[in-house]
Curated annotation (Swiss-Prot), chain B:
Entry-linked InterPro entries: Ribosomal_uS19, Ribosomal_uS19_bac-type, Ribosomal_uS19_CS, Ribosomal_uS19_SF
One GO CC annotation: small ribosomal subunit
HAMAP family named in the record: Ribosomal_uS19
Entry's transmembrane regions: none
Official protein name in the record: Small ribosomal subunit protein uS19
Function: Protein S19 forms a complex with S13 that binds strongly to the 16S ribosomal RNA.
Keywords assigned: Ribonucleoprotein, Ribosomal protein, RNA-binding, rRNA-binding
Species name: Paramagnetospirillum magneticum (strain ATCC 700264 / AMB-1)
GO biological processes: ribosomal small subunit assembly; translation
Family classification: Belongs to the universal ribosomal protein uS19 family.
Length: 125, 92
């Protein structure tokens, strides 16, 4: 059990993998952290010494934006676009894809589940 | 991919002249522009541009936040009024 960057308690997985449970840290940053601290790849979180945990915590605090701060930063960026009244902001407001994808079909990630169209007959056999 | 820094921001050359003239005249009237692809520069802040959207000129008051965006981003070219509700639709 180790608390790193607030609420995250990665389990008895390898350190490299456990760190990716933190929002804002993926494989690339996890590799960066472990190599710069010289933690061997096969080391698991429950085998970390208190000193190493402390070092990881400090490194993340110093170099990376994670969890709440990162979420807030992303939300602020989106809010800025929306307040600006630019095209990307309008797309965010309407919940449509922002990067110019087609919306004739697909785009279900942004639009959510398909809504039934009134009056359209179902093809039944 | 982002534009190379060494090229500097893109804009059509006559934009600067237009902006200067508008500043010199003092009155804040809408500057009509067709160049939607030009970058908004710091010296445009406070001016109002009429950005052409293919049909009419959409007035855009340039604020500090807009620096780095393109003029076209603030002048939507499409209108979508939503889908009309079909009155003949029957409930089954």
């Amino acid at each position: 059990m180790a608390r790193i960057a607030g609420v995250n308690i990665p389990t008895n997985k390898r350190v490299l993998i456990a760190l990716t449970y933190i929002h804002g840290i993926g494989r690339a940053k996890a590799t960066e952290i472990t190599t710069s601290l010289g933690i061997p790849a096969e080391r698991r979180v429950n085998q970390l010494t208190d000193d190493e945990v402390l070092k990881i915590r400090e490194l993340i605090d110093r170099d990376f934006q994670v969890e709440g701060d990162l979420r807030r930063a992303v939300a602020m960026n989106i809010k800025r676009l929306m307040d600006l009244g630019c095209y990307r902001g309008l797309r965010h407001r309407r919940g449509l894809p922002v990067h110019g994808q087609r919306t004739h079909t697909n785009a279900r990630t942004r639009k959510g589940p398909a809504k039934p169209i009134a009056g359209k007959k179902k093809v039944t056999k | 991919m982002a534009r190379s820094v060494w090229k500097g921001p893109f804009l059509d050359g006559y934009m600067l002249g237009k902006a200067d003239k508008a500043r010199a005249s003092g009155r804040n009237e809408v500057i009509k522009i067709w160049s939607r692809r030009s970058t908004i520069l710091p010296q445009f802040v406070g001016l109002t541009f009429g950005v052409y959207n293919g049909q009419k000129f959409i007035p855009v008051l340039v604020t500090e936040n807009m620096i780095g965006h393109k003029f076209g981003e603030f002048s939507p070219t499409r209108t979508f009024y939503g889908h009309a509700v079909d009155k003949k639709a029957k409930r089954k």
